């Protein structure tokens, strides 16, 4: 480390230590480390634990080894409130045990992609980090039900838990978790493919504060599970059911009758959902802001009519691969309150019946920011150009296949490659 010969710089004389610490608190990690090399006085100030309450090592993930985490934990101690180790694949259980012992006031911990960690890390967190509120274990594939039992015993203040792609988790783990962590507000279970309806029943019984639930690709879930959730979690605002291919309109009915605060619904690839279900949903869930209905192949313009009438706050809508949607449905959407005032994103990829007429209707959507039109075969470059003349700020994503080369001139058919000619 390179220090100056004197610590008697003017700034150190004029400003009290408390003010210098306050200034340093606004600096990022890299800048703090640079300041630490200026002088001995600044080294002490820059590495003061109070400046290291929030640490994000994502930009250095390939270089972060366990000893780095251990050193940070010793430096920060009880000051550290938030740490992100997202993508730090070199960090394992031993380092995180040291971290947990030293940083007992941690509230927000991101271990997304830390594939070396196992249940041992969760035991350490349970034992030492009782103030933990936010924990991300995405893709920590060695985590099992034992981790959830430990967390439920020692981290009862937990409000957010991401277990996406932790595919060893089963209903037994979820039951243990929710019995202890009854204040959960967000639970993300994407790709937890072993979960069944019974897991959702446990959530219904214990997580009445839940506002966000992600069940993407939990392919064993049926209407029974969704109905249970809706009956117990009336505060639900965001629900992802994408890839839950067993679901029918019964799930939408339960949502409509029990979850009036719903703002986000993702139901991509739920191919059994129909206009009837979305009609009941729209008539009861007036707070809807974002909907992903990609590959809901049975819905028609009727769904868009109901959304136009009853969902004035709608901002983002995906209808990709909904091949029964026509210009008529887009007309209703664009003429509605949400079309005029709120709509920002509309995805219409592979809507084969949509034509340039829809683009004319969408000129009414003055707030539109992004429009997806891949493989809309009846939409033309000219139509897009006319719309962008009216909405110059909108980003239009489309693809037009290269022009097919003209047929060969008469008499030149059945041409052979040079090798064949030689042979």
UniProtKB/Swiss-Prot annotation:
Cross-link (Glycyl lysine isopeptide (Lys-Gly) (interchain with G-Cter in ubiquitin)): 201
Annotated compartments: Membrane
Translocase in keyword set: no
Membrane-spanning parts: none
Membrane topology category: Lipid-anchor
Domain of life: Eukaryota
Annotated region described as Interaction with Calmodulin, given as residue ranges: 80-90
Molecular-function GO terms, alphabetical: calmodulin binding; phosphatidylinositol 3-kinase regulatory subunit binding; protein phosphatase binding; ubiquitin-like ligase-substrate adaptor activity
Covalent lipid sites (S-geranylgeranyl cysteine): 420
Impact when changing residue 404 to A: Abolished phosphorylation by GSK3B, preventing ubiquitination by the SCF(FBXO3) complex
Modified sites of kind Phosphothreonine: 404
LRR repeat start and end residues: 61-87, 88-113, 114-139, 140-165, 166-191, 192-217, 218-243, 244-269, 270-295, 296-321, 322-350, 351-375, 376-401
Disulphide bridges: none
Protein name: F-box/LRR-repeat protein 2
Lineage start: Eukaryota, Metazoa, Chordata, Craniata, Vertebrata
Underlying gene: Fbxl2
